[in-house]
Amino acid sequence: MVTSLEDVKEAVEFIGFPCYLKYTQRHIEAVSNHLILYSEADYEAAQDKIALGTCILEAWIPSEKVVSLSVVRNERGELLVYPPFEQVQSSAVSGTQVRYPVKLHEEVEREIRRLGRYLVETLALVGCMTIDFLVTSAGVVYINSVEIGAKDAAMFTLGAMSLSCYEAMVRAVVGLPLPSLVPLADAAIALPLEALNAEQVMTQYMLRTDWGFALFNPMGRNPLDLEGQVIVTGDSLAHCQRQIELTDILKK
């Protein structure tokens, strides 16, 4: 935990540059905006960030993939472990894409699932936990963040799985049994609505029964101001990508 610039400087002596600073409190509006410190020149920005709340300073880990896992548990101890999915940042698409399945060595995927089960069972959680992992090119797995509840990235389950992560979480909280999970497609790519052509999205919404559409209007916003994701499903990631290109749903 760091609460002052002096704490940051002291920690940097041990972990070195680059490193990144992130908030510990979920209620802060910019909680997901981590600050990367490359040199002492970034101390001023670090000071501004710390002024808003307690932070954690961590070493920068060069990772090959950001892999997320959502696990749901009810009070009976039943578990529903969703398949790991990859979060991808691309210069061609604004925002974060979610891709399923993620290519992982069998041992790496087994360890990710084991850690997810261990955390949920150790905490005796009733509800949903979403864990972000950093996976290096050598197959080393680091836990990057743990959040109670389904993250936005879990929206891909609305079109790709027989039971969405959100519905499973509600079932767990109200004490209902958790059914078996069945993938509805071999692959899926979830695209943030902000990166898409709204007119083309509405066209596909009227035509498609095989895609998922997680569209909602935030409270207090203009009725036409939608947010969410479009989940493109297919036989493979390449097939999903081809559909994205053919339907021309990406903004130019």
What kind of region is each of these model predictions?
Residues 171-252:
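Peripheral (often C-terminal) accessory segments that flank ATP-dependent C-N-forming ligase machineries
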Residues 80, 141-145:
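Protein kinase-like catalytic core scaffold
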Residues 68-70, 130-134:
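Short, surface-exposed charged micro-motifs
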Residues 1-68, 72-122, 234, 238-248:
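Active-site nucleotide/adenylate-binding loops and adjacent lid/helix of ATP-dependent enzymes
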Residues 18-20, 54-58, 130, 179-180, ...:
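A short linear hydrophobic-aromatic micro-motif
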Residues 136-138:
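Activation-loop N-terminal segment of eukaryotic-like protein kinases
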Residues 111-131, 147-195:
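Active-site "cap" helix and flanking loop/linker of ATP-utilizing ligase/carboxylase catalytic domains
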